[in-house]
Every structure is written in structure tokens, then in C-alpha cells.
């Protein structure tokens, strides 16, 4: 036997994996179940025995329209660190990707994604909610991250956003004074414009500002 001076090889028995979830319009963070478990969960749903933490829905669009799919559902990430944030083009849509990890040994990265730019050329509600809190986020500190949806009693419109706690403190938007109930900071407002004889709102200045802040934050995370 060769004397290698203590140098040896230990096989790696565990492999870090990545878990992908998507924030849906109903505020749930959803992970599609693999084919092996999907049939079992769909059958349980049909028998009225669906386990907590799962749901079954029927696809309404695309080539698989009408097909039932099983999904794991979540609404919170606890004691995690945001380690990366970036955007990507997917199926003709610009999306925001947030990568979380609880920083424990062999813990998987959690990729949370949602629409970044919507059909109105403005920033999606969940992405906008995060971006407006960026100035108050402490990079390298753990956080609790959750998603929500509510209906505005005055307008009847749905509002969506995220809630972040760091060091037991709820992070607020950096662009609103919640005591004086007024806007603050240099974030621009949407402009009312006339198109084809109709008045509408142009969110371009807001979107450009928020995208700039998101890109700065993305670089800051990479440099940390």
C-alpha cells in the first residue's frame, strides 16, 4: 500500500439539490409533483382524502388543457438567506428568480420565481413589493419570506405582495411613510396618457426605475 501522507478520498453520499417553486396569482408558492406521486395524489383528491399541503387542479391552457396536475403548496419560507436574485426570459415572458438557502449543511437551494413584467408593461405585484423593500433588506441576514393576496375594499381590485421579516422586524416599502400615509423617496409615479382617444396609465417610468433597483440589488448579492 502506498504511503500518501494522509491524503485520501471520501465518497460524497449527499448531493445538494434545487427545489423550484412558482408564485401563483392566488399567492401560493407551488411546486409541481412528479409523475410517480401525481397519480396517487390525484386519486386521493377524487376520494376526498387529499393530504394537507397538496392541491389538484385542471390545466386551462396549452396543449395539455383539461389535464389534472398535482402540486405541493407553500406560503412561507422561514429562516432563509436570500443568496441570489436575477431575471430571465422564459416563454416570451420576463421573470424574476429569487434563490434562498437556510445555510445548513446539505440544504437545497430554493428557486422562487414569478412574473417580473406583466402584460401592462408594469412590474408584477409580487416583484414590485419585493423591489420596494430592497433598500431595507440586510444582505447576509436570514429572513422570513411569505406571499399574500387581498381584495381592496374600496376598489374591489386584488392586491398582491410579499412580507419580509428580518431580525424580528417587518420590512416596509422604502417609498411610503406609513405614519404620515404619504409617498416618499424618488420612485416615479405612473403617468396618465391618451392612447387611441382613451386615457390610460403609463407605468413605464415606474417599471424602468424598479428594474434598475432590482439589477443593482442583483449585483450587490453577487458581490457579497
Regions found by a protein language model. Name each.
Residues 119-129:
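Short, structured beta-strand/loop micro-motifs enriched in basic residues and often containing a Trp
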